[in-house]
From Swiss-Prot:
The gene is ispDF. This is Bifunctional enzyme IspD/IspF. The lineage of its organism: Bacteria, Bacillati, Actinomycetota, Actinomycetes, Micrococcales. Residues 1-257 are annotated as: 2-C-methyl-D-erythritol 4-phosphate cytidylyltransferase. 4-CDP-2-C-methyl-D-erythritol 2-phosphate binds at D264, V265, H266, H290, S291, D312, I313, G314, T385, T386, T387, D388, F392, R395. Bifunctional enzyme that catalyzes the formation of 4-diphosphocytidyl-2-C-methyl-D-erythritol from CTP and 2-C-methyl-D-erythritol 4-phosphate (MEP) (IspD), and catalyzes the conversion of 4-diphosphocytidyl-2-C-methyl-D-erythritol 2-phosphate (CDP-ME2P) to 2-C-methyl-D-erythritol 2,4-cyclodiphosphate (ME-CPP) with a corresponding release of cytidine 5-monophosphate (CMP) (IspF). The keyword Transferase applies. Residues 258-410 are annotated as: 2-C-methyl-D-erythritol 2,4-cyclodiphosphate synthase. NCBIfam families: ispD (TIGR00453), ispF (TIGR00151).
Length: 410
């Protein structure tokens, strides 16, 4: 399905406009989140039942000053991003636009800048992944930009000892950390100067301050906030969850965790195509079943339903539903994930062990993990064993899968 690049909600840039908000905020939410391993764009990952984007947007909309906000989204999840914006912005929806991002972060920021209304003279660029950034930090950066007439970034002193090393790992020396800071977002700039810097930019830069400086702009650092850390890895996500739980008075997230186990077995049926782990395997003998016989997907469903206390796949879906005759495992996974979330749980992760002599999983493991992760909206890991040629799986008579799932009560 194709989408217009801009979801109508605010006027596009009007070069000479003076009426309207002077502050613009570009919220970059177009990242894939590959390192997080969630299978969905990082900004749509939940912390405490609320997406990172929603938390970031809530902080922005908490500003006392009127602002025009542009959320930059991946083209693959434009509708989902717009739905989050609709829910968070409410009556302020008219001041928030959603645009499609570029191939790089720099391209995404450029798209966001182009969508700001003409009255904006001060721009803040913020990563949606820094979801716990307090509203006060946005206000402080905006004030500093106007006071300095320069670029302004929040930062915190580097506390770890920093070493310089060569490509072989040989330590070349210790860096004096007294003048080092780790920078955060939002990063603020005079709008005209930032537009000019982007117009001249030829190389890719790691942040907007570097791009601004490369074009001759001056950048100042103001005190940052420990809560403005970026959620990049699973560890960062756990840290954010614990902070949210603490603030909500809900205690440790571990007290709300539940696990489940699921097992599924299907006999080989050479007359059928093979669907396993959400993938079609051309040239391989298929599996017998009412649906497509995807033992991996079915075991995952049972594990998730068990963890949430919802029963099992047979009791939920049955074999008498004509709509599910021949249905692919991805259909069951998406429906199961929806049931689990409707029951008040967040899916933390799923791990699956496949027992089979064929197909060989290793060459397509990463592809399968991406498909399965996207279907349940959480990280999925896949492993395989031939069971040393023992039993019905070792003889090639069938395929078995065992899955474990972890969910968290919200």
């Amino acid at each position: 399905m194709s989408h217009d690049p801009v979801v109508p909600s605010a006027p596009a840039t009007d070069g000479g406009a003076t009426d309207g908000p002077r502050l613009g905020v570009v919220v970059v939410a177009a990242g894939s989140g590959t390192r997080l391993g969630a299978g969905i764009p990082k900004a749509l990952v939940e912390v405490g039942g609320v997406t990172l984007l929603a938390r970031s947007l809530s902080s922005v909309l908490g500003l006392a000053e009127e602002a025009h906000v542009v959320v930059v989204a991946p083209d693959t999840h434009l509708a989902e991003t717009s739905a989050v914006v609709d829910a968070v912005a409410g009556a302020a929806r008219g001041s928030v636009a959603v645009v499609v991002g570029g191939a790089t972060r720099q391209g995404s920021v450029r798209a966001g800048l182009a969508a700001l209304v003409g009255s904006v003279d001060t721009v803040l660029v913020h990563d949606a992944a820094r979801a716990l950034t307090p509203t006060d930090l946005f206000a402080a950066v905006a004030r500093a930009v106007r006071a300095e007439g320069a670029g302004v970034v929040p930062g915190l002193p580097v506390t770890d000892t920093v070493k310089r090393v060569d490509p072989a790992g040989e330590c070349l020396g210790t860096v004096d950390r007294s003048d080092l800071v780790g920078v955060q977002t939002p990063q603020g700039f005079p709008r005209a100067a930032l537009d000019a810097a982007y117009a001249r930019a030829a190389a890719e830069h790691t942040d907007d301050a570097a791009l601004f400086q490369a074009s001759g702009g001056r950048v100042r650092v103001i005190p940052g906030d420990a809560l403005a850390f970026k959620v990049t890895t699973a560890w960062d996500l756990r840290r954010a969850e614990e902070l949210v739980a603490r603030d909500a008075g809900a205690g440790s997230a571990s007290s709300r965790l539940r696990s489940g186990i699921g097992t599924d077995v299907h006999a080989v049926d050479a007359s059928q195509p093979l669907w396993l782990a959400g993938l079609h395997w051309p040239g391989e003998a298929g599996l017998a079943g009412h649906s497509d016989g995807d033992a991996v997907s079915h075991a995952m469903c049972d594990a998730l339903l068990s963890a949430a206390g919802l029963g099992d796949i047979g009791g939920i879906f049955g074999t008498d539903d004509p709509e599910l005759d021949g249905a692919h495992g991805e259909v069951f996974l998406r429906r199961t994930a929806e049931l689990v979330r409707d029951a008040g749980y967040r899916i933390v992760n799923v791990a699956v062990q496949v027992m089979a002599v064929r197909p060989k999983l290793s060459p397509r493991r990463a592809e399968a993990e991406r498909i399965l992760s996207a279907a349940v909206g959480a990280p999925v890991s896949l492993a395989g064993t031939t069971t040393d040629g023992l039993g019905f799986t070792g003889r090639g008579d069938g395929v078995a899968a065992v899955a474990t799932a972890l969910v968290e009560r919200l």
